[in-house]
Amino acid sequence: FPHEEIIEEGEYSDDTQLILCLSRSLQKGERWWEHFTQVELPFWSVYERGGGGATKRAVESWLDGVMPWSSSRKPQDVKRYYDAGGNGVAMRSLPHVLRLGEMEFSKVATNIFLDGIATHGHPRALLGALAYGFALWAAFRKDSKLAYGELVEELIKNVDLWSALPATPSIPSEWRSQAEKSLQDYMKLW
């Protein structure tokens, strides 16, 4: 039920809560995604405040021990997951950039993407997070003052870099097949 959530000074919003969930997960090293999806997201449901519908639905799925895109879920639930295009993924980009900022963006992009599919399936959410992540990555690599519009120019100049669907074996194969099934021409939308 919709309601207004008052967040007092010193308290955390859902975005800050999820950034902290992700940050704790990243401390687990290579197994960060498993920790994020199996521990942090399910536990977040106990104390969340103001989380978006897509994230809450994905968390319910993780609580059931099922990936949000799993073919074992109701088709309408999987479709709803792939229709989810909010900004929650973008809000969680910063920890990946801070952790991997010295590396090539492709590594950062892979982590942002894997983080994103934990809660959202639509290209709008995932590409938005990759664009924002690239802007953060580019800004942190600068050792001089940013000029007005410089990050926008960097995004435009490097669109092929940040907008590519990460090519990694880490992406569950069922995620790809369900994406095409749920959103016809997923890659065209991408």
Model-predicted segments: where are they?
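Structured, active/binding-site neighborhoods that engage oxygen-rich ligands
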Residues: F1-W190
